Amino acid sequence: MPPKPRNGYLPTAAANTMSQPQTPLRALLLHGIHMHAWVMLPLAWQLRRHNIHSRCFGYYSIAQTLPQHSRRLAEAVRRHYQQHQEPLHFICHSLGGLVLRRFAADYPELVRGRSVTLATPHLGSETANRLHRYAPALIGGAYQNGLDGNLPP
């Protein structure tokens, strides 16, 4: 008999056999453009249930440039995680993934874990190109060397 859907999803064998890590993992969550750190809280709460301690890093997505976000992220990582020996993982949505890429290029010594980017425009964004052309204030500092696709590898 096939498994029954639960909450709209089919259970997988991996989900049934996954064990929680013995020592808590640490993760830093980065939000996308025009968002606030609190939008990542539901994900942080779910991660906590699986013994992953996380913080939500907030930044002014369009008021500053990616290098400025990268610098602030480096300050936060040094302040909150430098004393820990275990890896720090990153989970990023949209522009947050571009901030992480810039951070990894600028501060490779601070990247000691894995990264997941969700809906990040790694190759640039056609929508951002149009907005930059017709309403540049809507994307501000996030465009140049970020949403335009000109980012370090």
Predicted regions and their residues:
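Serine-dependent carboxylesterase/thioesterase catalytic core
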Residues: 27-38, 48-60, 64-153
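Alpha/beta-hydrolase fold catalytic core
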Residues: 1-25, 41, 45-52
